[in-house]
Amino acid sequence: MFFQAGAIIILLLFYGCYFGKMFLQKKKGIQTDQIGKGKTGRSKAIELIMKVATIFVPLTEMLSIYTNYSILSGMLRYAGSVIATAGDIVLVISVLTMKDSWRAGVSETDKTELVTDGIYQISRNPAFGGFNLVYIGILLMFFNWIFFMKSCKVVYISIK
């Protein structure tokens, strides 16, 4: 029950931050979701695969949390909860630091300020780092092979 409750809190914060920021920016007339827009060829395909994965991974996460099944030891599950929590922290700091320049995807038309302070001194895209930490952490908490394959795909696409 500890892992289930913790994972639900982690995911609520994660998706709350992501969709909350999109909502707040939409109220200001800013189109946050730029994934696959204005792209062609390989770039568009990669971004659309990533967009589809962002729909299916949460479904897999919720199913894994619901079953509360993991083939990993309790120690690795605890490590997963720490890693996923770190991912939430990185994402929240990234979104707050980026202010209104934050986008999901790159807009060809919006001219935003390049953010180079705060967490962006360490990483060019710390939000993806936060995503990956959350996905890896939840994977460790509820390890199963289906979830493993989906998580690897998302992490691979975001790194590439």
Residues covered by each model-derived region:
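Membrane-anchoring alpha-helices and their flanking helix-loop junctions
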Residues: 1-109, 113, 134-160
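Active-site-proximal inter-transmembrane loops
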Residues: 105-128
